[in-house]
A protein has these predicted regions:
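Adenosine-phosphate binding glycine-rich loop
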Residues: 30-69
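Rossmann-fold NAD(P)-binding glycine/threonine-rich loop
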Residues: 2-5, 13-36
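C-terminal catalytic/substrate-binding lobe primarily of soluble NAD(P)-dependent oxidoreductases
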Residues: 54-294
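Short Asp/Glu-rich motifs
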Residues: 22-23, 46, 72
Length: 294
């Protein structure tokens, strides 16, 4: 909010539980353009959906995404590309999705499926609360869901932690001290889940949109597989998230998008040239999304 009041344009990738769209009028009053949730997912998934929502009638949208280490070390077979407590929060936050035009809430980690992916092999997908602004900006799309990807077996371990109370927020008394199980668990897992500076890892995402285009039923898919870049010493999560953000920054600097207010990517994507600019910007940095239409 301070940035808006100061009259500064901004592109943001951070998670916060509040609804950024509530600041839309304030941003307009201060002649500010703010693009929010502009990472990989939410972020690129929103760019893709926002663009295709202008050229096809979408009935169904699904995004599956995950960041994983290439080396699978038991028991977790996981490394966190960001703070472990943020990952644990994602594992406990109720997941909202859209079914037949209605917002439905399910427990996080529900609807586990095993899915085969090119390059990554078999991964398990499960519900997480990643649709965010899409729940409210895309009312014409009747079915939408977002799922996170992990190696098979990881979620059973997390579910055991949840059942045992290790991810509870309510402090409990331990030897005269108030201790939050969630904070304690995050501290324990910090070193185990810490991604090494040059550790091989990858980011994978599959976006599926089904609907009508040119009077034909079509399925449009975008597939991302990106690995640690040895030449630049940057992780795939840094690249796929950070370059999406800097692409949007360049949109503002070049005045390709200058509307005032709060805009998640799906509301910027329909502006002529913006989606193409972002895709080209990423491709020039070797972040490639493969499109297929069937």
């Amino acid at each position: 909010m301070v940035v808006i009041i100061q009259g500064k344009n901004v592109v943001d990738i951070s998670f916060f539980p509040e609804d950024a769209l509530q600041l839309h009028e304030l941003a307009k009053q201060h002649s500010v353009t703010a693009i929010v949730d502009c990472g990989v997912a939410p972020g690129m998934s929103n760019w893709v959906l926002g663009y295709y929502n202008t050229i096809m009638k979408i009935d169904q949208f699904e995004c599956m995404v995950g960041g994983l280490p290439k080396l699978r070390i038991k028991p977790w077979e996981y490394k966190a590309p960001f703070s472990p407590i943020d990952v644990l929060e994602e594992y406990t936050r109720p997941a909202r999705y859209v079914e037949n035009g209605h917002i439905i809430t399910k427990p996080a980690l529900s609807d586990v499926e095993l899915i085969d992916f090119e390059y990554a092999g078999t991964l398990e997908s499960f519900n997480t609360d990643g649709l965010r602004s899409l729940l409210f900006t895309m009312p014409d799309i009747l079915n939408m869901k977002e799922k996170t990807l992990r190696y098979p077996g990881h979620i059973k371990l997390i579910q055991s932690l949840i059942k045992a109370g290790f991810l509870n927020h309510e402090p409990m008394q331990v030897q005269g001290q108030q201790v939050s199980p969630m904070q304690f668990t995050s501290k324990i897992l910090f070193e185990q889940w810490k991604l090494g500076e040059a550790e091989p890892e990858f980011t994978i995402m599959k976006i599926i949109m089904k609907g009508m285009m040119h009077d034909k039923q079509v399925c449009v898919e975008y597939f991302l597989y990106d690995e640690y870049d040895e030449a630049t010493k940057t992780s795939s999560m840094s690249r796929t998230t950070g370059y999406t953000c800097t692409a949007a920054v360049n949109l503002l600097l070049k005045n390709f998008f200058n509307e005032k207010g709060i805009f998640p990517p799906e509301l910027v994507a329909p502006t002529p040239g913006c989606f193409e600019f972002v895709m080209d910007y990423l491709a020039k940095r070797n972040v490639h999304y493969r499109k297929t239409v069937s």
